[in-house]
C-alpha cells in the first residue's frame, strides 16, 4: 500500500483536474482508510460548479469548505491542506476557504488514495493532469506557488 507515503496528522492533497461534465453528480478524490468515516476529500459536489473539501475523523466532520467560483469542467489546480486547527482550500493560486477548528487523524490512519469518496462511491469521471500528496502542511507561499 501507500500508507508510508501519507501523513495522517497533517499534509496536502493536490490535484490538477477537470470533470467531464457539470451534471450535478458527486465526483471525489480522497485520502482515506478505505471507509467514508476517515477521509480527506476534494469533491465536485451535487450542485452546479460547486467544489467542496471535507475532513472526517471517525465519521465526525472536522472541516468543511466550499466554493462556487469556478467552472469545474475547466482544469483547476486544487489543494486541500489539513492540520489540526488549520485547514484550507486553495484553487488556482488563491486561498478560497479556511477552517481553523478541527482535529486530524491518529498516526497511520490514512493508507489509501482513491478517485472516489473513500468507500468506492462517488467515482471521479474526469481528466487528471497531476495528483500529489504531501506529508506536511505547506505554507501559504508554497500553496500559492503549487496552485498557480
Label each residue range with its predicted role.
Residues 1-10, 65-69, 119:
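Short surface loop/edge beta-strand patches of beta-sandwich-type extracellular domains
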Residues 34-42, 57-64, 119-124:
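Short, surface-exposed beta-strand/loop "edge" segments at domain boundaries and coil↔beta transitions
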Residues 11-21, 114, 121-148:
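Extracellular, beta-strand-rich glycan-interacting domains
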Amino acid at each position: 500500500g501507500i500508507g508510508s507515503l501519507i501523513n495522517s496528522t497533517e499534509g496536502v492533497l493536490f490535484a490538477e483536474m477537470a470533470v467531464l461534465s457539470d451534471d450535478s453528480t458527486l465526483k471525489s478524490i480522497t485520502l482515506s482508510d478505505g471507509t467514508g468515516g476517515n477521509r480527506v476529500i476534494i469533491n465536485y459536489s451535487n450542485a452546479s460548479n460547486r467544489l467542496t473539501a471535507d475532513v472526517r475523523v471517525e465519521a465526525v466532520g472536522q472541516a468543511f469548505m466550499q466554493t462556487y467560483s469556478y467552472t469545474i469542467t475547466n482544469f483547476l489546480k486544487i489543494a486541500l491542506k489539513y492540520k489540526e486547527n488549520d485547514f484550507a482550500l486553495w484553487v488556482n493560486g488563491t486561498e478560497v476557504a479556511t477552517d481553523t477548528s478541527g482535529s486530524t487523524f491518529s498516526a497511520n490512519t490514512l493508507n489509501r488514495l482513491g478517485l472516489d469518496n473513500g468507500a468506492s462511491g462517488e467515482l471521479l469521471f474526469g481528466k487528471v493532469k497531476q495528483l500529489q500528496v504531501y506529508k506536511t502542511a505547506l505554507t501559504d507561499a508554497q500553496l500559492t506557488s503549487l496552485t498557480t
